[in-house]
């Protein structure tokens, strides 16, 4: 059997809890498509005692999200904390500096520190994935990067944000 991709998840609000539920509910399908299982192994959130409607007892709990980056049993860190600076940025830097892949939906952090983080990821040979932060999660980044590889795209203008779409509708 192929080794699982081991995930450290920071942030257990609506989105973080949803990630765990989706990975549980669709485990077999995800494993077939990814050619390996994806398992959350460690988690972190501000309030350990908050009821979230899911069983978290099977995961290692860390009180400081930045500890996820240093864990030997974590291959990729998913950040769903939010905020341009503070714990989210520290976690991003430490994860990428450790040569581990980093996934985020954090628009604010990417707007303020995206170039820095992309540079660090490139230097360390890690992946920085932020598809969920763009266009309400519509997979446009991968499509543009891979599907338009022979074209030079200088910029794209428009409202491609799920929050704006929700407000405007």
Question: Each predicted region: which residue ranges?
Answer:
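N-terminal glycine-/serine-/threonine-rich beta1-alpha1-beta2 phosphate-ribose binding loop
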Residues: 1-98
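Charged, alpha-helix-enriched surfaces in structured cytosolic catalytic cores
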Residues: 14, 135, 139, 151, ...
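Glycine-rich beta-alpha junction loops
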Residues: 44-48, 134-136, 159-165
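General beta-strand structural signal in soluble alpha/beta enzymes
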Residues: 61-63, 70, 78-79, 103-105, ...
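Rossmann-fold NAD(P)-binding glycine/threonine-rich loop
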Residues: 83-98, 105-146
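Glycine-enriched alpha-helix->loop->beta-strand junction motifs that scaffold or abut catalytic
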Residues: 99-101, 162
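Conserved anion/nucleotide-ligand pocket segment
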Residues: 146-169
């Amino acid at each position: 059997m192929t080794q699982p991709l081991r995930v450290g998840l920071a942030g257990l609000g609506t989105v973080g809890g949803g990630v765990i539920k989706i990975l549980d509910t669709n485990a077999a399908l995800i494993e077939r498509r990814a050619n390996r299982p994806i398992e959350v192994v460690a988690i972190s959130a501000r309030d350990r005692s908050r009821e979230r409607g899911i069983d978290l007892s099977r995961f290692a709990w860390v009180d400081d999200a930045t500890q996820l980056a240093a864990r030997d049993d974590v291959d990729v860190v998913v950040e769903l904390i939010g905020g341009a600076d503070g714990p989210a940025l520290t976690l991003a830097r430490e994860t990428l500096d450790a040569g581990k892949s980093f996934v985020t939906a954090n628009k604010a952090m990417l707007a303020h520190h995206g170039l820095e983080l992309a540079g660090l990821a490139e230097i360390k040979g890690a992946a920085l994935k932020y598809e969920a932060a763009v266009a309400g999660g519509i997979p446009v980044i991968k499509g543009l990067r891979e599907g338009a590889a022979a074209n030079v795209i200088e910029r794209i203008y428009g409202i491609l944000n799920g929050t704006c779409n929700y407000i405007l509708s």
